């Protein structure tokens, strides 16, 4: 039996076994502007979450052997995967260390693989290896950290990327401790870009701006309120992504080059509109 656990829309915990949704916990977030705009979900409930996950399973094979692993289209203008996709295409980074359902931690320099695996998922907590998906990932130029267990270990993923002789390495992390550990691998030759994702509910810390290069604000109250004066650049106003370092700012600007209708302005950051997730936590 394969088993997958994902923190999905609303910060609800979803368990999928053998392609079937078997558990959905009560969502902590009731409204997400992205899902309202793109999927017409005005209120996040256990039922709407289950329907959305079942749609993803049917649409692109989420958590199953039918998983589509590559995608060249942008899902949203500036999601985490889109930003990494542009950075890889423009050689601002050499490789990305990401997490995928059915495979765990992945190391890849293929921008379409990053988009395919990460563009339409939420926070993967646990996953089981599915051989057919792993084979597709490897054929597309991905290195699976642990094919037997589908282990999720971003620190070990960065170490593997270094072993493979990559120098500018982006890594997605979901907590401050992982960001610290990955940053500890930097030296004069190795540059690590830590990209904080799925950070709803993160606790406030002065170290956030020290160890994260980029953060997606998700439905985080802390990131919207406690980073004033520390944000070097911002993209988006509803669910913004903040650059907290010069390296992060460089990566955001690389993404901006791939977009039209771009406004560049000097502001006191963050700049937020009224259409925020509800509630912020």
Swiss-Prot record:
InterPro entries: Methan_mark_8 (IPR009181)
Top-level lineage group: Archaea
Alphabetical list of Pfam families matching this protein: DUF2099
Name by which UniProt lists this protein: Uncharacterized protein MJ0054
Organism: Methanocaldococcus jannaschii (strain ATCC 43067 / DSM 2661 / JAL-1 / JCM 10045 / NBRC 100440)
């Amino acid at each position: 039996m394969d088993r997958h656990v994902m923190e999905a829309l609303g910060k609800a915990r979803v368990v999928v076994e053998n392609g079937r949704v078997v558990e959905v916990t009560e969502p902590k977030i009731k409204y997400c502007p992205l899902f309202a705009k793109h999927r017409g979900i005005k209120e996040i409930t256990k039922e709407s979450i289950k329907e959305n996950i079942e749609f993803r399973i049917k649409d692109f094979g989420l958590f199953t052997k039918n998983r589509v692993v590559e995608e060249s289209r942008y899902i949203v203008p500036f999601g985490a995967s889109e930003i990494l996709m542009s950075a890889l295409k423009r050689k601002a980074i050499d490789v990305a260390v990401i997490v995928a359902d059915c495979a765990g931690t992945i190391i890849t320099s293929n921008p379409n693989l990053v988009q395919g695996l990460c563009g339409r998922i939420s926070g993967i907590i646990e996953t089981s290896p599915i051989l057919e998906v792993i084979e597709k990932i490897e054929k597309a130029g991905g290195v699976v950290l642990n094919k037997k267990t589908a282990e999720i270990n971003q620190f070990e993923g960065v170490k593997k990327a270094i072993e493979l002789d990559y120098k500018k390495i982006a890594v997605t992390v979901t907590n401050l401790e992982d960001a610290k550990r990955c940053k500890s691998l930097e030296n004069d030759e190795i540059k690590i870009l830590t990209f904080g994702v799925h950070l709803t509910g993160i606790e406030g810390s002065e170290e956030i701006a020290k160890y994260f290069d980029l953060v997606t604000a998700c439905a985080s109250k802390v990131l919207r309120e406690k980073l004033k004066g520390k944000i070097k650049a911002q993209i988006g106003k509803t669910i913004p992504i903040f650059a907290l370092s010069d390296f992060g700012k460089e990566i955001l600007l690389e993404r901006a080059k791939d977009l039209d209708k771009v406004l560049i302005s000097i502001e006191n950051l963050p700049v937020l509109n009224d259409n925020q997730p509800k509630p912020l936590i």
